């Protein structure tokens, strides 16, 4: 066989028209390989020390002959091809659906099959899935085994398995429709929330304590979370303590506000300090004496610039503030420090 192969290649090369450039190139490459001895089958070894990446491929037959009415290609692809994409990402492999029946347009598939192009040779084979891995030897075989185990689930002709239900839910979500009771929920997977449906809000009771949602049954024996009041059983209280529902009782942990700081500097109410010295007994004596003795002349009344001091200014301010002219004159005599007439001359 090998003796006849090289002469056949040489004869085919001579018979080819020069316009077939790609065919001539391929024939020349094949002749060179055979002459160098690369065409012989050699034993393949795996070097795990160098751990060089290797290419591993395997064809998995799709059982369309046993189950001709089941759409295996649709189940493998999923909505918008997402199922096959996720399967490749999970197994870290490359998967391709090839063979007869892999294309939707049957007329175009037949046309491409008859075209004779190398990339369409797979259309002559049975429908299959090509799994390819490019990784170090140990990891490559591990990925291939994982891929074979996972793709087996997609080759079971079941219309109501978990994969089919998940695909129906995903298709409903992608179409923008609302999920109804006709689409069952996949076990072990969360239900998809449709658009426009708000998330359940967490209600808070009085005092900031988180309350349980209405209709949620808490199993018996479950510990109550911190900060949540238990709804079953009476509220236990110690002897002499008020119940939490009593009105007027401050909540637990309540601290009274600290007393207001004393005014030490001139602030918002600093005008009180200006009138604070006018409320002693000596000031009242000077007010009464000034009103009990009338002014002698107009000059005495207007000549207030002479002998002006802080004590007289405070007394004048208190005169308008307290209006002491309706009081009876004090029986006590004024001391020598104060004058009988605050606006009189010396």
From Swiss-Prot:
Induction: Induced in proteinuric diseases. Down-regulated in immortalized fibroblasts isolated after a proliferative crisis accompanied with massive cell death. CDD domains: KH-I_KHDRBS3 (cd22470). Signal peptide: none annotated. Its main location: nucleus. Ubiquitous with higher expression in testis, skeletal muscle and brain. Expressed in the kidney only in podocytes, the glomerular epithelial cells of the kidney. Strongly expressed after meiosis. Residues 213-267, 318-346 are annotated as: Disordered. It holds the Pfam family Sam68-YY. There is a cross-link at residue 4 (Glycyl lysine isopeptide (Lys-Gly) (interchain with G-Cter in SUMO2)). One of its GO terms (molecular function) is SH3 domain binding. Phosphorylated on tyrosine residues. Isoform 1 C-terminal region is tyrosine-rich, but isoform 2 lacking this C-terminal region is also tyrosine-phosphorylated. The proline-rich site binds the SH3 domain of the p85 subunit of PI3-kinase. Self-associates to form homooligomers; dimerization increases RNA affinity. Interacts with KHDRBS2/SLM-1. Interacts with KHDRBS1/SAM68; heterooligomer formation of KHDRBS family proteins may modulate RNA substrate specificity. Interacts with the splicing regulatory proteins SFRS9, SAFB and YTHDC1. Interacts with HNRPL. Interacts with RBMX, RBMY1A1, p85 subunit of PI3-kinase, SERPINB5. Interacts with SIAH1 which promotes targeting for degradation. This is KH domain-containing, RNA-binding, signal transduction-associated protein 3. The lineage of its organism: Eukaryota, Metazoa, Chordata, Craniata, Vertebrata.
């Amino acid at each position: 066989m090998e003796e006849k192969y090289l002469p056949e290649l040489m004869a085919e090369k001579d018979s080819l028209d020069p316009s077939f450039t790609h065919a001539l190139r391929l024939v020349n490459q094949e002749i060179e390989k055979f002459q160098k001895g690369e065409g012989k089958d050699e034993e393949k070894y795996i070097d795990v020390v160098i751990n060089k990446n290797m290419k591993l491929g395997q064809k998995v037959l799709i059982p369309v002959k046993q189950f001709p009415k089941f759409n295996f290609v649709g189940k493998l692809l999923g909505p918008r091809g997402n199922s096959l994409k996720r399967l490749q990402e999970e197994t870290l492999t490359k998967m391709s659906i090839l063979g007869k029946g892999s294309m939707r347009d049957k007329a175009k598939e037949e046309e491409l099959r008859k075209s004779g192009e190398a990339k369409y040779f797979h259309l002559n084979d049975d429908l299959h899935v090509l799994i390819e891995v490019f990784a170090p030897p140990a990891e490559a075989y591990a990925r291939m085994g994982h891929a074979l185990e996972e793709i087996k689930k997609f080759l079971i002709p079941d219309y109501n398995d978990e994969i089919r239900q998940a695909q129906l839910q995903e298709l409903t979500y992608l179409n923008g429709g609302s999920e109804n009771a006709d689409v069952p929920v996949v076990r072990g997977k969360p239900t998809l929330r449709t658009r426009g449906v708000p998330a359940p809000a967490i209600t808070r009771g009085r005092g900031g304590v988180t309350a349980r949602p209405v209709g949620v049954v808490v199993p018996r024996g479950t510990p109550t979370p911190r900060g949540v009041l238990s709804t079953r059983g009476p509220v236990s209280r110690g002897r002499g303590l008020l119940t939490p529902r009593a009105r007027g009782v401050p909540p637990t942990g309540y601290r009274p506000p600290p007393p207001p700081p004393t005014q030490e500097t001139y602030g918002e109410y600093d005008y009180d300090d200006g009138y604070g010295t006018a409320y002693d007994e000596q000031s009242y004596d000077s007010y009464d004496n000034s009103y009990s003795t009338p002014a002698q002349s107009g000059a005495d009344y207007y000549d207030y610039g002479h002998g002006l001091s802080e004590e007289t200014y405070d007394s004048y301010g208190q005169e308008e503030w307290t209006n002491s002219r309706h009081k009876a004159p004090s029986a006590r005599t004024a001391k020598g420090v104060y004058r009988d007439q605050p606006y009189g001359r010396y």
